């Protein structure tokens, strides 16, 4: 008997030693995660405390924002890193990278009347260009869309079909002096050219109303435009924060992410403090449980400048490492004040834009979350305008949630979700008014619980989930840019 007890003691010691260093303290004694238990750990007070903390980082600096590489974002990154590290449940790292920051301002007048314009980030500067305005056909995505007399003139282009950067490049190839892109949905237009390019010309954005008025004026006579663009550029060091559970199968990784940066204009509390805090709240709640599959959380940098942080991360993984990631969930703007509950259309049934195999199952899981509670929801398209894009391009199944940005809510949607028709989902989108006061508490709480629901499901088991597609390269979808406004589900505006 003594020898048997000694053998048992040795076995227990060996098992315990095997757990230490691989799994967090107390792991064997934690209950297995379930959907109900993890959701019950989500508290609105914790979520709101988190978004208030992000607001404080913006308020603490003269810039009043959390743009990547700036002080407000540095504070954000350090806080996220330290909060998650302190749990002891995760292996946490900061992934350093350098990206080009750009800030631009524009002044545009037509026939002496000043218009409300915004410069595209990464636009070349322009000092008082004075030229006649001409109109590009279609959406200015092809050389044949530009009039023969474009050289030396400023060209007016409607948003849609291709990126702002491509429009600017095509205008440059046509030897235009500048380009003005106007919105194809109500509201003003601010965006990015996606990076520096010698083909680009000075480029500004206008509202749909102002753009259409200019097109009407040109049809009846000559329009002279004066255009000024001030552009600043700076290489900035910045970081992704990546945290993976110490426990669970690291060859079957469930991954989720949200971008942690804002635009220059404001603190970015809905866009995307809501997603950042949503996944942080779930990350902290998850520490109460054990799981079967490892879960990897990511807080992406520089999303607002062209999905730079997530793209950098995905490109840093070889096919073998990326194949361990069985799916990716994206959460970008989940607390919009005039919200709609939107789920990425993984099966393509609404927009004919399917994600990689497994994306449909992700969509169905979120649908079940809402359906089981009798809560309305609607699909939103994979447009390539948020951080899932780099994953889809490498054939990783993707999905997630979104409560709306600049698109205007319809009367039909009001019947489903409440709110106000004729008003954007987020009227403070990309503006200084995107503060804590901009958050819809009901929306952010519900969507954070939905995140917990999905993570609990996949952390327990991937049974029934399609075999992970072979890692490869693919387009997000050749039709993605044809969505109204460049996307009714994603908001990094480079198209």
UniProtKB/Swiss-Prot annotation:
Could you tell me what the cofactor note in this record states? Binds 2 Zn(2+) ions per subunit.
Binding residues annotated for Zn(2+) 2, in chain numbering: 271, 304, 430
The entry's Zn(2+) 1-binding residues are: 259, 271, 332
Write down the glycosylated positions: 142, 235, 272, 352
Q: Where is this site: Transition state stabilizer?
A: 429
For this chain, one GO molecular function annotation is:
metalloexopeptidase activity
Q: Where in the cell is it found?
A: Secreted
- The highest taxon in the source lineage is Eukaryota
Query: Which keywords describe this protein according to UniProt?
Result: Aminopeptidase, Glycoprotein, Hydrolase, Metal-binding, Metalloprotease, Protease, Secreted, Signal, Virulence, Zinc
Leader sequence range is: 1-21
An annotated GO cellular component of this protein is: extracellular region
Q: Which GO terms describe its biological process?
A: proteolysis
Residues forming the catalytic site: 303 (proton acceptor)
Is Nucleotide-binding among this UniProt entry's keywords?
no
Please name the top-level EC class of this enzyme: hydrolase
Q: What is its EC number?
A: 3.4.11.-
> Is Magnesium there in the keyword field?
no
Task: Report quaternary structure and partners.
Answer: Monomer.
What is the protein name for this chain? Probable leucine aminopeptidase 2
Q: Give the organism, scientific name.
A: Arthroderma benhamiae (strain ATCC MYA-4681 / CBS 112371)
């Amino acid at each position: 008997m003594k020898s048997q007890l000694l053998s048992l003691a040795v076995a227990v010691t060996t098992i315990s030693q095997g757990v230490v260093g691989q799994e967090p303290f107390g792991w064997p004694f934690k209950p297995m995660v379930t959907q109900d238990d993890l959701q019950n750990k989500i508290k609105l007070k914790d979520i709101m405390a988190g978004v208030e903390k992000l607001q404080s980082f913006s308020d603490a600096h003269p810039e009043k924002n959390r743009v990547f590489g700036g002080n407000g974002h540095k504070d954000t990154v350090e806080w996220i890193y330290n909060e998650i590290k302190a749990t002891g449940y995760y292996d946490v790292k900061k992934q350093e990278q350098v990206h080009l920051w750009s800030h631009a301002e524009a002044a545009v007048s037509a026939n002496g009347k000043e218009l409300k314009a915004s410069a595209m980030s990464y636009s070349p500067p322009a000092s008082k260009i004075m030229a006649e305005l001409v109109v590009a056909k279609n959406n200015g995505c092809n050389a044949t869309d530009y009039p023969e007399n474009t050289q030396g003139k400023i060209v007016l282009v409607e948003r849609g079909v291709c990126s702002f950067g491509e429009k600017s490049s095509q205008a440059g190839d046509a030897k235009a002096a500048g380009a003005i892109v106007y919105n194809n949905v109500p509201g003003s237009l601010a965006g990015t050219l996606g990076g520096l390019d010698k083909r680009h010309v000075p480029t500004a954005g206008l509202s749909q109303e102002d753009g259409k008025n200019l097109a009407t004026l040109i049809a009846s006579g000559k329009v002279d435009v004066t255009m000024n663009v001030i552009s600043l550029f700076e290489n900035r060091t910045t970081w992704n924060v990546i945290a993976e559970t110490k426990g669970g199968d690291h060859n079957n990784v469930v991954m989720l992410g949200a971008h942690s940066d804002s635009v220059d204009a404001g603190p970015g509390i809905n866009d995307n403090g809501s997603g950042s805090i949503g996944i942080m709240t779930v990350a902290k709640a998850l520490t109460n449980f054990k799981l079967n599959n490892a879960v990897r959380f990511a807080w992406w940098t520089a999303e607002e400048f062209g999905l730079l942080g997530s793209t950098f991360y995905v490109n840093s993984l070889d096919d073998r490492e990326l194949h361990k990631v069985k799916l990716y969930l994206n959460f970008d703007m989940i607390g919009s004040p005039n919200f709609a509950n939107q789920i990425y259309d993984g099966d393509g049934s609404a927009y004919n834009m399917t994600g990689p195999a497994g994306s449909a199952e992700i969509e169905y899981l979120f649908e079940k979350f809402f359906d089981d509670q009798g809560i309305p929801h609607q699909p939103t398209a994979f447009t390539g305008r948020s951080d899932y894009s780099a994953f889809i391009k490498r054939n990783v199944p993707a999905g997630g949630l979104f409560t709306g940005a600049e698109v205007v809510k319809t009367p039909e949607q009001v019947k489903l979700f409440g709110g106000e028709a004729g008003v954007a989902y987020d009227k403070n989108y990309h503006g200084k008014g995107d503060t804590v006061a901009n958050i819809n508490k009901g929306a952010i709480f519900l969507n954070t619980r939905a995140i917990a629901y999905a993570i609990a499901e996949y952390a327990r088991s991937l049974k029934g989930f399609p075999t992970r597609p072979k890692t490869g390269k693919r387009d997000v979808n050749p039709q993605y840019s044809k969505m109204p406004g460049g996307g009714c589900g994603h908001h990094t505006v480079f198209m």
